[in-house]
């Protein structure tokens, strides 16, 4: 049985591709060879990670899902023994969610012996309410066969609204039973950890590539090592990974 990790969120620029890359690297760190697929019709950021051998597959035709291309995606997933990591774009969020639900894809994957794990991201700052709403939409609409992992990304500010943390918000408390794990991306000090991590993401480098790059200072690599450990330890604790 393989786990199909799908990153879904209707807001653009909130770290979806970075999360897909972290999941794929975590799998590789465990000796697995995940099948990585980028379906973002606008920004193929995930595909930019050459070390992850990401396959590009455009599943959109205008504003609609191209059902033939989606069929190709299912055919790729069906026989796999390896876990799959799929990055999806913000522009395909609504049609893809609708297509997955109306065609009962989560149940189909379960019949194949696979498990659908939806990773969604909630971010601080201006996009907080949009991303919280995106999570609530997914959790309330997807059937029980789909599992959920919520990533909290504080890059643009703390994840709190009217004094409430994410775990205290109605969107979470109403859907708590659907959430298997919450992954907290650390709030990184901007001039050190934050800059190092940002630079690595901009360059589409994996942690392994960055740590092997002798042009980076020893302390930069040390900080990246600490960030990786913090993320991977949380993924170790997430039962659905």
Curated annotation (Swiss-Prot):
Coiled coil: none
Keywords: Conjugation, Plasmid
Record InterPro entries: CobQ/CobB/MinD/ParA_Nub-bd_dom, P-loop_NTPase
Pfam families linked: CbiA (PF01656)
Domain of life assignment: Bacteria
UniProt similarity note: To plasmid R751 TraL.
Name of the featured protein: Protein TraL
């Amino acid at each position: 049985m393989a786990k199909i990790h799908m990153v879904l969120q209707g807001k653009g620029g909130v770290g979806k591709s970075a999360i897909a890359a972290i999941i794929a690297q975590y799998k590789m760190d465990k000796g697995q060879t995940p099948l990585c697929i980028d379906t973002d019709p606008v920004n193929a950021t995930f595909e930019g990670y050459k070390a992850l051998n990401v396959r590009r597959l455009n599943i959109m035709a205008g504003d609609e899902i191209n059902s033939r291309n989606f069929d190709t995606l299912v055919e790729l997933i069906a026989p796999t023994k390896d876990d799959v990591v799929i990055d999806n774009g913000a522009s395909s969020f609504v049609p893809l969610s609708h297509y997955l639900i109306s065609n009962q894809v989560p149940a189909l994957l379960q019949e194949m012996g696979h498990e659908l794990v939806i990773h969604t991201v909630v971010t601080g700052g201006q996009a907080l309410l949009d991303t919280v709403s995106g999570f609530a939409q997914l959790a309330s609409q997807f059937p029980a066969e789909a599992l959920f992992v919520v990533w909290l990304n504080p890059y643009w500010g703390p994840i709190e609204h009217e004094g409430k943390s994410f775990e205290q918000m109605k969107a979470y408390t109403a859907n708590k039973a659907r959430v298997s794990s919450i992954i907290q991306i650390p709030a990184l000090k901007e001039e050190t950890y934050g800059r190092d991590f940002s630079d690595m993401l901009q360059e589409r480098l994996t942690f392994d590539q960055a740590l092997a790059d002798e042009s980076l200072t020893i302390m930069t690599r040390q900080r990246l090592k600490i960030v990786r450990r913090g993320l991977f330890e949380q993924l170790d604790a997430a039962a659905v990974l």
